[in-house]
Regions:
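Functionally critical transmembrane alpha-helices in membrane proteins and complexes, commonly lining
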Residues: 6-65, 83-91
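Structural signal for the C-terminal ends of transmembrane alpha-helices
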Residues: 63-69, 137-143, 199-208, 262-269
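Aromatic-anchored segments of alpha-helical transmembrane domains
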Residues: 21, 92, 155-167, 222-235
Length: 278
């Protein structure tokens, strides 16, 4: 049964605003060449890079919280209508209005690029569809496993995936080399930790919220250290891409998500106390 979770509303809203800010700064840098590329602005953008991964988390959290290990009848048909059709229409439009092809051949090239090669910002819809399938196939098995161990393992896998793309040169094989290109953005392995975090928090939401305040300082310190780690990677030139596909993003996004729920738990406690006083 669907239930309203206020923290998800705020997570979604802040993630949307963050994406707008990220692209506004990037567009300013790319279109106005006389604007200096400020390091402080780039670091500010990095702080907002939780946005796209958070949508993966939110999708799986809501699915796990509302339906558990099962999926309601007509689920995939519904998603194909409300996500699949817009995905096609938006990519067809981007291929024409943004790339401005000179002929049909160019247009079809851009359509193929945006649809199947991650050539447009809509690529995250493909990622979310992959996780819908994974939830359908594996959720009943995931419930029987240790959540903390699975989340830690998934963070390591996701981190190693982005580290591979960052620090290892692509192979000569053109099919494998595609993983190092934009196609690699669309593979679920690079987003696995957000999926499992969403699944387990959604599945055990009540128990999670009852316990989260016990780990207040762990979460705050962990978030602070993850920011320092991310900033150092950028400043020292270890990873200078300003995007969510970074080696330090999985742990950073995890801590940001936990901060949202931690803050929500204290807000709920405050409202409960006020109601009791009345």
């Amino acid at each position: 049964m669907k239930t309203y979770t206020s923290v998800i509303f705020w997570m979604r809203s802040i993630a949307c605003l963050s994406i707008v800010i990220i692209h506004s700064i990037t567009t300013t840098f790319s279109k106005m060449h006389d604007v200096p590329h400020s390091t402080s602005l780039r670091l500010f953008q990095l702080l907002l890079m939780f946005s796209t991964p958070m949508f993966v988390f939110i999708s799986e959290f809501l699915l796990a919280k509302n339906y558990g290990s099962k999926i309601k009848k007509g689920f995939f048909k519904n998603k194909l209508i409300y996500l699949g059709i817009p995905y096609v229409i938006i990519n067809l439009s981007i291929s024409y209005f943004y790339f401005r092809p000179k002929n049909l051949h160019e247009y079809l090239f851009h359509v193929g690029d945006t649809m199947f090669h991650g050539g447009a910002v809509t690529y995250f819809i493909v990622i979310i569809f992959q996780f819908y399938l994974l939830h359908w196939l594996f959720s009943k098995y995931l419930i029987g496993l240790n959540p903390i161990k699975m989340i830690v393992i998934s963070i390591l896998i996701t981190t190693m995936y982005w580290a591979m793309r960052t620090f290892i040169s692509p192979p000569n094989n053109p099919i494998l080399a595609a993983i190092w290109d934009r196609e690699g953005w669309m593979i679920f392995i690079g987003w696995l930790s957000y999926f499992l975090l969403g699944f387990y928090i959604g599945t055990y939401y009540e128990a999670f919220m009852n316990k989260i305040k016990d780990y207040t300082w762990h979460i705050i310190i962990g978030a602070f250290l993850s920011i320092i780690f991310m900033f150092l990677n950028y400043i020292l030139g270890i990873s200078t891409w300003v995007e969510s596909k970074r080696v330090d993003t999985p742990i950073y996004v995890t801590m940001v998500i936990l901060l949202f729920f931690l803050f929500s738990s204290y807000i709920c406690l405050l409202y409960t106390s006020d109601a009791a006083d009345e």
